[in-house]
């Protein structure tokens, strides 16, 4: 199977998101990379499901709370930007202060 660098990046991010999802389900607090991966995956999947950029920007702030992550992680993540493929093209979804 031949993958472009972009496809490899998406696959790696999705894999990290699955690991984060499983750890969260076991009750573990997520670290910085896991939190980024989980939020990014949820946003990419939302785009695939047909949600709008505005909906995803709002939804991105509800995925994780400070209780879901290790101490200090919310302060480290001020912005997340995810490039998503929508039916009308590729767009950048920005989530400001995603963990409250």
UniProtKB/Swiss-Prot annotation:
<comment type="subunit">
    <text>Heterotrimer of UreA (gamma), UreB (beta) and UreC (alpha) subunits. Three heterotrimers associate to form the active enzyme.</text>
</comment>
<dbReference type="GO" id="GO:0043419">
    <property type="term" value="P:urea catabolic process"/>
</dbReference>
<dbReference type="InterPro" id="IPR002026">
    <property type="entry name" value="Urease_gamma/gamma-beta_su"/>
</dbReference>
<keyword id="KW-0963">Cytoplasm</keyword>
<comment type="pathway">
    <text>Nitrogen metabolism; urea degradation; CO(2) and NH(3) from urea (urease route): step 1/1.</text>
</comment>
<dbReference type="GO" id="GO:0016151">
    <property type="term" value="F:nickel cation binding"/>
</dbReference>
<keyword id="KW-0378">Hydrolase</keyword>
<dbReference type="Pfam" id="PF00547">
    <property type="entry name" value="Urease_gamma"/>
</dbReference>
<dbReference type="InterPro" id="IPR050069">
    <property type="entry name" value="Urease_subunit"/>
</dbReference>
<dbReference type="InterPro" id="IPR012010">
    <property type="entry name" value="Urease_gamma"/>
</dbReference>
<comment type="similarity">
    <text>Belongs to the urease gamma subunit family.</text>
</comment>
<dbReference type="GO" id="GO:0005737">
    <property type="term" value="C:cytoplasm"/>
</dbReference>
<dbReference type="GO" id="GO:0009039">
    <property type="term" value="F:urease activity"/>
</dbReference>
<dbReference type="InterPro" id="IPR036463">
    <property type="entry name" value="Urease_gamma_sf"/>
</dbReference>
<protein>
    <recommendedName>
        <fullName>Urease subunit gamma</fullName>
        <ecNumber>3.5.1.5</ecNumber>
    </recommendedName>
</protein>
């Amino acid at each position: 199977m031949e993958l472009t660098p972009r496809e490899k990046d998406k696959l790696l991010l999705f894999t990290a998101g699955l690991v984060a999802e499983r750890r969260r389900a076991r009750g573990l607090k997520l670290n910085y990379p896991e939190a980024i991966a989980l939020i990014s995956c949820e946003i990419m999947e939302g785009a695939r499901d047909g949600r709008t950029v505005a909906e995803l920007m709002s939804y991105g702030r509800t995925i994780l709370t400070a209780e879901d992550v290790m101490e200090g992680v919310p302060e480290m993540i001020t912005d997340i930007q995810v490039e998503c493929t929508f039916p009308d093209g590729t767009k950048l979804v920005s989530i400001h202060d995603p963990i409250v």
